[in-house]
Amino acid sequence: MREFEIREKQDKINQTDYWDGRILDLQILYFGDEVHLYIESYHENKVDLEECWKVSFLACAELNYETDAQNRKKFKVKDFTQNHLYTCQEISLEYYDDSFLKTTIVLEGLVMLNIISRDVTVAKIKQSEHDFFWRNKS
């Protein structure tokens, strides 16, 4: 993938204003071919309860991630409520080769993902159209 294409995609990601935003979900689908990251969005400096950002990594050639399971002691991520979700610290794209790019994602709590994919897309979606794992929890 060419450098200017990577810069354009990085700009689109940066426009989500993801820094310190809550990660509403992370999905790895189709045996790792697609990875979707759902990020809380803001409207006029307030959390947008209707919409969120969906950053999709498509045609993934490699996926590597580390979690904070060793540091979490007894609680499980599946038991998180919306107020206890991870926040995003960094999403950076870089050249990998002519067809792929490398993405590094850092979430607070020592969670790190490295993804080599053919494409990255960014879209704003309605939260009501997605069944987040933390819904309906106290």
Features from the language model and the residues they span:
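Surface-exposed, interaction-prone regions used to assemble/regulate multi-protein complexes
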Residues: M1-S138
